[in-house]
Amino acid sequence: MIKINISQNFLVAKGHALFAEKGKDIVCAAISGIIFGGVAWFEPDKIEFTENKLVPSIALKLIDPTPNVAVAFSVITVQLKAIANSYPNHIVINEESYE
């Protein structure tokens, strides 16, 4: 199962979806595509991004959350939630309150 922790300025995704065998897992591919596609949009000085293929995990932290950066991060979050709603046995999202 992929576990995703999301806050106002960061997200961490860990694990495998285990929807299908390695290389054919559409759920893992969707999550990776959303996160890596989002990362490609950000200017490098606006974020910190790390990937660990051994664990596996991906972490994204906003360094300079300007309004445009915040909107882009929200889009990533909405997309991840859509996949989680479609595949609840393979993805769980925990949101930290930021009020």
Swiss-Prot record:
Gene3D superfamilies: Cysteine protease Prp (3.30.70.1490)
Top-rank EC class of the record's enzyme: hydrolase
Active site: 16, 28
EC number: 3.4.22.-
Keyword Protease among record annotations: yes
Record's keyword annotation contains Protease: yes
Gene Ontology BP annotations: proteolysis; ribosome biogenesis
InterPro entries reported in the protein's UniProt record: Peptidase_Prp, Peptidase_Prp_sf
Alphabetized UniProt keyword annotations: Hydrolase, Protease, Ribosome biogenesis, Thiol protease
Entry's family note: Belongs to the Prp family.
Subunit (UniProt): Homodimer.
Protein name, per record: Ribosomal processing cysteine protease Prp
Organism of provenance: Mycoplasma genitalium (strain ATCC 33530 / DSM 19775 / NCTC 10195 / G37) (Mycoplasmoides genitalium)
